[in-house]
């Protein structure tokens, strides 16, 4: 029989007591009551913050959007296929935030800045909250620097400044994305960091945009944030805030940034879907009551910062899609009232072959004229006036049979100016060349050129000016105005090229 040795037992117990390390871990845990359609109702979570990140037992992350008396309404940011009634949920104590920094430039990421381009992890040491307060009045400076789009019609008549919010609005298939992409391409070499946010678009469309940016060397200063049509509504709702947060990091470092939200109609639809599933009361067009705040708190983050904060800027180009040209619908009117102007793209003009299809009549820039360079101001005023008169005369000329010579001349010039503003996709024009083309159009240099030859004349003249009078470009770029010397060089180049062109035609 084995004898029991008390001293051995007591030494084992003593050893166990010495090694015992008590760790008390308090977690805020809840239980899933119901789950479906990307929404979970959770019971038992106390002290949860609004917009706090919650973690489900299968690893899915959600955001607490509805804090009710007896349960929490959570929007899932993943599939959540393995979730079921009774699953446990724990609060993380963190509000939605994303990693930011230089490492994101040139990458394609999702709404939580997870890479989706297969180029490995993004190394970042800093995070920023998705919902940051917009700069206050004292922290801002009025817009005064130009944000050149490279599109003649916009830079001349609807100029955009750094720190401005300019809405691009129009029906589907009118070239809204093309205007935004051209603007990004035109920032090459200017030191502007661009963020392109694709919301609820087909993955193939986003891939096409990324290819265009890569082929033209624009991806090296651009971040693409993609929340595709197949992604959960929560990610489509968050993507614009992610884009703003990524740009904000650079803005507060004193850099100029440009953010394109393509498009906010889809974000509003994703938010409507989430709100209705969370049983929030619907308002006009079934959107929730706070859909205005959804967009205003996003677009107010665009700013030109004061010298004390480093004079960085965030320029926002939100895109909104209209149905059959109806700009008086709920989301379009909301965003028009928030932004500092809008570029209206018309399907009628697009189908008539005028591309970019900008309707100059109802497009406006509320602060951009202060940001125009003097050279452009010198020539743009006359262009606006002549085009406005042409539109009036054209409507009148449809009914009149015989027109006097002056009216015929004005109509002919208007048609040539219209041709002058046509521009192929993905080919932005430098501002000094835009000034030269508008000068040629408004000062009668195109009057003898047949209307159907204007496009080839302008393309050839740009090349001729660049090669024969390189000093003209240097003068306009350095002085920012069309001085006597620059104007003299431009006139001689126009006269010489016009003679050659007419001789060849």
Curated annotation (Swiss-Prot):
Return the Pfam families for the record. ATP-synt_ab, ATP-synt_ab_C, ATP-synt_ab_N
Q: Which reaction does it catalyse?
A: ATP + H2O + 4 H(+)(in) = ADP + phosphate + 5 H(+)(out)
Q: How does it sit in the membrane?
A: Peripheral membrane protein
**Which PROSITE patterns does the record cross-reference, listed alphabetically?**
ATPASE_ALPHA_BETA
SUPFAM superfamilies tied to this protein: C-terminal domain of alpha and beta subunits of F1 ATP synthase, N-terminal domain of alpha and beta subunits of F1 ATP synthase, P-loop containing nucleoside triphosphate hydrolases
Q: What protein family does this chain belong to? A: Belongs to the ATPase alpha/beta chains family.
User: Which named protein is this?
Assistant: ATP synthase subunit alpha
Q: Which organism was this protein described from?
A: Cyanothece sp. (strain PCC 7425 / ATCC 29141)
């Amino acid at each position: 029989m084995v004898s029991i040795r008390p001293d051995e037992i007591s030494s084992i117990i003593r050893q166990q007591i010495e090694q015992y390390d008590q760790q008390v871990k308090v977690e805020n845990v809840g239980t899933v009551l119901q789950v479906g359609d990307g929404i979970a109702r959770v019971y038992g979570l106390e002290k949860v913050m609004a917009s706090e990140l919650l973690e489900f037992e299968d690893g899915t992350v959600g955001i607490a959007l509805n804090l009710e008396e007896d349960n929490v309404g959570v929007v899932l940011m993943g599939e959540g296929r393995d979730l079921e009634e009774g699953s446990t949920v724990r609060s993380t104590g963190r509000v939605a935030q994303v990693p930011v920094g230089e490492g994101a430039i040139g990458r394609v990421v999702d709404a939580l800045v997870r890479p989706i381009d297969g180029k490995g992890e993004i190394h970042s040491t800093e995070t920023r909250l998705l919902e940051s307060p917009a700069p206050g009045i004292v922290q801002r400076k009025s817009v005064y620097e130009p944000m050149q789009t490279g599109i003649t019609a916009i830079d001349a008549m609807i100029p955009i400044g750094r720190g401005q919010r300019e809405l691009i609005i129009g029906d589907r298939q009118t070239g809204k994305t093309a205007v935004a992409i051209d603007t990004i391409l035109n920032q090459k070499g200017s030191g502007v960091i661009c963020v392109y946010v694709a919301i609820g678009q087909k993955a193939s469309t986003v891939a096409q945009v990324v290819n265009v940016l890569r082929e033209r060397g624009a991806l090296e200063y651009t971040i693409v944030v993609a929340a595709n049509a197949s992604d959960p509504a929560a990610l489509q709702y968050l993507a614009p805030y992610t884009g703003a947060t990524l740009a904000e990091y650079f803005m507060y470092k004193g850099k100029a940034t440009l953010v394109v939200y393509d498009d906010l109609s889809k974000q509003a639809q994703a938010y409507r879907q989430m709100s209705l599933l969370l049983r929030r009361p619907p308002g006009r067009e079934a959107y929730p009551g706070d859909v205005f705040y959804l967009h205003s708190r996003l677009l107010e983050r665009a700013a030109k910062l004061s010298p004390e904060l480093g004079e960085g800027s965030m320029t926002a180009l939100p895109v909104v899609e209209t149905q059959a040209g109806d700009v008086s619908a709920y989301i379009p009117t909301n965003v028009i009232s928030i932004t500092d102007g809008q570029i209206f793209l018309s399907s009628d003009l697009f189908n008539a072959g005028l591309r970019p299809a900008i309707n100059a009549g109802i497009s406006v820039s509320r602060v951009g004229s202060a940001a125009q360079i003097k050279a452009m101001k010198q020539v743009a005023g006359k262009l606006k006036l002549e085009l406005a008169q042409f539109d009036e005369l054209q409507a009148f000329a449809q009914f009149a049979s015989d027109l006097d010579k002056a009216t015929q001349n004005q109509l002919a010039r208007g048609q040539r100016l219209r041709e002058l503003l046509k521009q192929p996709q993905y080919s932005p024009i430098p501002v000094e060349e835009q000034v030269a083309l508008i000068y040629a159009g408004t000062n009668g240099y195109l009057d003898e050129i047949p209307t159907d030859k204007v496009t080839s004349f302008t393309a050839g003249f740009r090349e001729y000016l660049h090669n024969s009078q390189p000093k003209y470009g240097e003068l306009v770029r350095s002085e920012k105005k069309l001085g006597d010397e620059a104007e003299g060089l431009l006139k001689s180049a126009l006269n010489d090229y016009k003679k050659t062109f007419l001789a060849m035609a």
